[in-house]
Amino acid sequence: MAKSRFEYVRQFEVHDALLPDTYIVVRVDGKKFHEFSKYYNFAKPNDERALKLMNAAAKNVFMQYKQEMICAYGESDEYSFILKRDTKLFNRRRDKISTLFVSLFTANYVSLWNLFFPDVVLHHKHLPYFDSRCVCYPNLTVVKDYLSWRFVDTHINNLYNTVFWYLIIKCGLTPQESEQKLCGTLSSDKQEILFSECGINYNNEPEMYKKGSLVNSKGEIVHIDVVKQIDEIFNGF
């Protein structure tokens, strides 16, 4: 940068470095995706195209910085990227890492859109956008619990949404009636309602819907029980 009398303004910049010797998780999350998915008429309760687009965008981000990564996990409109404890990426600057991941993810989402929605044109007034945050976790136990939390959240949300929407689509309930029917129900109750009233066995739903998507250390997209295979996922890290 050229020297000038105005250069003093750089003194006001803050370079917030993330804590050293900690695992960094960057979570990218869709903003106003309820409106976005409604405008583009995403299928309910799950849109396979949309989920595969998220996976493709996440994999490209992962592969771009594979040497810094352990894995990435996504469901719905969010993705978590778990960086190695000793990463020196951008000198661990919070703003650099956060903005890089969210901009790279968004760019890939938009550029890959036509591969998954070939007959749907993105409208300039209805573009996808995401936010991101960086969180430091002190040890592997906490990181494993973080990933397990996201996995369990996926199961809870997907089971509810699956039953909620099929009661509307297949049984003709209104959204209010469906919500009321599910109020106070346990997981087993929801599965029974889905089977007895909608004729759908939740166990036969696609693994991607039930378990989310993991980009493993090899860059492969898999749909596994994260809680049961948590030690295997982090083996060597």
UniProtKB/Swiss-Prot annotation:
- What does the cofactor section's free text say about binding? Binds 2 magnesium ions per subunit.
Any idea which positions bind GTP?
29-34, 76-77
One GO term of the biological process aspect = tRNA modification
- Listed InterPro entries: Thg1_C_dom, tRNAHis_GuaTrfase_cat, tRNAHis_GuaTrfase_Thg1, tRNAHis_GuaTrfase_Thg1_sf
Q: Which UniProt keywords apply?
A: GTP-binding, Magnesium, Metal-binding, Nucleotide-binding, Nucleotidyltransferase, Transferase, tRNA processing
Query: Which coenzymes or cofactors are required?
Result: Mg(2+)
| Entry binding sites for Mg(2+) 2 | 29, 77
Relate the protein's function as given in its record.
Adds a GMP to the 5'-end of tRNA(His) after transcription and RNase P cleavage.
Protein name (database record): tRNA(His) guanylyltransferase
Give the originating organism: Kluyveromyces lactis (strain ATCC 8585 / CBS 2359 / DSM 70799 / NBRC 1267 / NRRL Y-1140 / WM37)
